[in-house]
């Protein structure tokens, strides 16, 4: 069962790669592990866990559904949805999951599915339900990039009742989020995992902007989502440091000044310090910034 499930997931990975070579590293960043407790499949950012009977049934129904599920999990990782948590509100009596947590899960799923549905590749092309089309129409009214955080903000303003929330969850839920860091508050977050996916994210943006002539035609708003994500997390101070160079400038160099010799000279000769501080020092600065 382990081998069959792994074979199905590898086949999905390979089919996705044929059309989306800019995702090569992301698609190949997982090992595969059978887990009888998972609902379909899910990932923690390192391993894709699958329930063999459900995965096999999905593949027999339509392999495109497996392809979409694989890409869905990859996008969760690219945008680090697994690490998104927040202040919890009142808990539900039946399963202990907060409304806020359900809304975050739903927002992540909608954001990912919206990207997938906006991409024009045969390997993931699938008909959209009326509920899905109407949800997208309402979300797109603002005309802004629909990342998970923005979707969450809009959904919160809708004041969804239980029935509407459940209907949306059933429509957009694709994978099991139980393995996410945000679902394990007692477990220390792994900064290396977020850094790994951040670097993959950067590489994808570079590939799309530099090599993909069809970006924006077949990839929908995926590139714009990547740019938005990177802008929100990029440390521009670190970026500017790359352009700093060492040069000399006129200033007292206190760092190279030795007070021992200075005070010794004053003690020995009265008013003659043995060493004066240097009148220039090396500094690392950006010499000029040009705005165009």
Stretches with model-predicted labels:
Residues 287-288:
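A short alpha/beta connector and helix-capping loop motif
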Residues 1-67, 74-278, 282-283:
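Short, functionally important secondary-structure microenvironments
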Residues 291-292:
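Conserved small/polar residues in nucleotide/adenosyl-binding loops
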């Amino acid at each position: 069962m382990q081998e069959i499930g792994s074979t199905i997931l590898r086949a999905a990975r390979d089919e996705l790669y044929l059309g989306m070579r800019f995702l090569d590293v992301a698609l190949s960043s997982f090992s595969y592990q059978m887990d009888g407790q998972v609902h379909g499949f899910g990932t923690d950012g390192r391993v894709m866990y699958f329930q063999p009977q459900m995965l096999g049934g999905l593949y027999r129904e339509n392999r495109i559904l497996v392809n979409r599920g694989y890409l869905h999990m990859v996008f969760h990782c690219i945008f680090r949805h697994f690490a998104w948590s927040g202040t919890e509100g009142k808990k539900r009596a039946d399963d202990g999951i907060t409304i806020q947590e359900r809304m975050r899960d739903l927002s992540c799923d909608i954001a990912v599915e919206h990207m997938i549905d906006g991409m024009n590749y045969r390997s993931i092309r699938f008909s959209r339900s009326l509920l899905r089309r109407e949800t997208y129409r309402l979300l797109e009214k603002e005309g802004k990039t629909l990342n998970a955080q923005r979707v969450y903000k809009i959904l919160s303003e809708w004041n969804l009742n239980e029935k509407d929330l459940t209907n949306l969850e059933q429509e957009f839920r694709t994978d099991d989020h139980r393995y996410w860091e945000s679902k394990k508050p007692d477990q220390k977050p792994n900064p290396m995992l977020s850094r790994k996916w951040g670097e993959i994210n950067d590489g994808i943006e570079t590939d799309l902007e530099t090599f993909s002539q069809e970006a924006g035609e077949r990839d929908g708003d995926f590139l714009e989502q990547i740019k938005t994500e990177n802008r929100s997390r990029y440390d521009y101070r670190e970026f500017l440091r790359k352009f700093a160079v060492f040069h000399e400038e006129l200033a007292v160099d206190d760092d190279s000044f030795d007070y021992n010799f200075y005070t010794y000279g004053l003690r020995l000769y009265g008013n003659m310090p043995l060493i004066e501080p240097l009148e220039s020092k090396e500094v690392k600065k950006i010499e000029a910034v040009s705005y165009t």
